[in-house]
Swiss-Prot record:
Gene giving rise to this polypeptide: OPG040
Reported function: Negatively regulates superinfection and syncytium formation in infected host cells. Acts in concert with OPG185/A56 protein at the host cell membrane by interacting with and inhibiting the mature virion entry/fusion complex (EFC). This mechanism ensures that new virions released from the cell cannot enter already infected cells.
Signal peptide residue numbers: 1-15
A molecular function (GO) term: peptidase activity
Species per Swiss-Prot/TrEMBL record: Monkeypox virus
Protein name: Superinfection exclusion protein
Key word Hydrolase present: yes
Listed InterPro entries: Serpin_dom, Serpin_fam, Serpin_sf, Serpin_sf_1, Serpin_sf_2
Length: 375
C-alpha cells in the first residue's frame, strides 16, 4: 500500500449537518488534553483545522473508511453533499475587515503517478488540488505553493515526507484579530499566576469595560465565563476559569457552548488576563485513529472515490501558534479604546489555569481552543 500524509496548520450556529463536524474537533481536543502526560503543559489546538482535514479525507474515502469518517462527522451518506455545501457556505461567512483577518486554505498535493478519477478531479480541483513528483524537491514546491496561498512559510520539512508519500493534505488557518475593547497597555503589570505546581510572575493585562459574562454551573461546579469580542468580525474569544478545568473541558459540546454563550449578560468588568503566547507542534495520528482507524491501516484503508490506487494515511500533524496581547490575537498595533465604568465593576482575574475558545459565532466553528497552565 502507498502512504498518505495529512498536515493541518494554524497560525489562531452552524447548520445541523455540521454539528458533528464541530464536535469531532472538540472531541479531538479532549483526547489531546486527557492524553497529555504533563498536565502542566499549555495547549493550543485548531478543532476546525482537524475536522476540515478529516472531512476532506471523507470526500475521497470509500468502504469502511468512508463509514468510519461519516460516523466521525455524525453524517448519513445522503447528507454528505449538503454538508459540504453548508461547510463552503460557512467559510464564506468568515469575513475579513481592516480590523480582523481570517484566512483558511486547503491544498491537496497528489503525486503525478497517482491516477485521479476524472469525476473527483472535476468536482474538487478548484479547492486546491495539485499534481507533483514527491521524489523531486517536493518540500520546496509544497512550501512555495502554501506560502503563496496562505502567507505561512516552511509548513513542511523533510521529516514529514519520504519516498513513499503520494498524497499530502494541508489545511491552513491564519487569524489576526483586534479586540473590540483593547486592553490598556499602560495598565499591564506584573502579577502572580498560580497552578498546582507553584506561583510565578506574569505580565497581567487589564481593561475596565462592559463585557458579556456570567457564572455557569456544571454538575455543581461553578465557572466564570466571559466573552471578548473581536472588532467587526463575528468572532469571539471565550474565557473560562474555575477549580476543575478538566471537568469543564470534558463537558463542552457544540450545543452546550451555544447555551452557555446565550446565558452571558452585559456587565462592567475589571478584567485581568495574562499576556500569553503558545506554540504546539503535535503528531495527532493517534487522536484521529480513535475515530477512523481503518484509514491508517494499509490493509483496510480505501480512498477509491478519488483513485483506485491503494492509499493509506501514515502521518498526521497539526502545528499551531497563538499570541494574545493588549491589542488582540496575532494583532497589529491599533488605536486604544477604553471604556470607563459608571459603577463599581466586577473584578475577574485569570490568575490560575484557564481555557480559551476562539469561535466564529455565526457558524459555531471553533477556530482555536486551548488551555493556559502557565505563561
Amino acid at each position: 500500500m502507498i502512504a498518505l500524509l495529512i498536515l493541518s496548520l494554524a497560525c489562531s450556529v452552524s447548520a445541523y449537518r455540521l454539528q458533528g463536524f464541530i464536535n469531532a474537533g472538540i472531541l479531538a481536543y479532549k483526547n489531546i488534553q486527557n492524553g497529555d502526560e504533563d498536565d502542566n503543559d499549555n495547549i493550543v489546538f485548531s478543532p476546525f483545522g482537524y475536522s476540515f482535514s478529516m472531512f476532506m479525507s471523507l470526500l475521497s474515502a470509500s468502504g469502511n473508511t468512508r463509514v468510519e469518517l461519516l460516523n466521525t462527522m455524525n453524517l448519513r451518506k445522503r447528507d454528505l453533499g449538503p454538508a459540504f455545501t453548508e461547510l463552503i457556505s460557512g467559510l464564506a461567512k468568515m469575513k475579513t475587515s481592516k480590523y480582523t483577518y481570517t484566512d483558511l486554505t486547503y491544498q491537496s498535493f497528489v503525486d503525478s503517478t497517482v491516477c485521479i478519477k476524472p469525476s473527483y478531479y472535476q468536482q474538487y480541483h478548484r479547492f486546491g488540488l495539485y499534481r507533483l513528483n514527491f521524489r523531486r524537491d517536493a518540500v520546496n514546491k509544497i512550501n512555495s505553493i502554501v506560502e503563496r496561498r496562505s502567507g505561512m512559510s516552511n509548513v513542511v520539512d523533510s521529516t514529514m515526507l519520504d519516498d513513499n508519500t503520494l498524497w499530502a493534505i494541508i489545511n491552513t488557518i491564519y487569524f489576526k484579530g483586534t479586540w473590540q475593547y483593547p486592553f490598556d497597555i499602560t495598565k499591564t503589570h506584573n502579577a502572580s499566576f498560580t497552578n498546582k505546581y507553584g506561583t510565578k510572575t506574569v505580565p497581567m493585562m487589564n481593561v475596565v469595560t462592559k463585557l458579556q459574562g456570567n457564572t455557569i454551573t456544571i454538575d455543581d461546579e461553578e465557572y466564570d465565563m466571559v466573552r471578548l469580542l473581536y472588532k467587526d468580525a463575528n468572532i469571539s474569544m471565550y474565557l473560562a476559569i474555575g477549580d476543575n478545568m478538566t471537568h469543564f473541558t470534558d463537558s463542552i459540546t457544540p450545543a452546550k457552548l451555544e447555551y452557555w454563550s446565550s446565558q452571558l449578560g452585559n456587565k462592567m468588568y475589571n478584567l485581568k488576563l495574562p499576556r500569553f503566547s503558545i506554540e504546539n507542534k503535535r503528531d495527532i495520528k493517534s487522536i484521529a485513529e480513535m475515530m477512523a482507524p481503518s484509514m491508517f491501516n494499509p490493509d483496510k484503508a480505501s480512498f477509491k472515490h478519488m483513485t483506485r490506487d491503494p492509499l493509506y494515511i501514515y502521518k498526521m500533524f497539526q502545528n499551531v501558534k497563538i499570541d494574545v496581547d493588549e491589542q488582540g490575537t496575532v494583532a497589529e498595533a491599533s488605536t486604544i479604546m477604553v471604556a470607563t465604568a459608571r459603577s463599581s465593576p466586577e473584578e475577574l482575574e485569570f490568575n490560575t489555569p484557564f481555557v480559551f475558545i476562539i469561535r466564529h459565532d455565526i457558524t459555531g466553528f471553533i477556530l482555536f481552543m486551548g488551555k493556559v497552565e502557565y505563561t
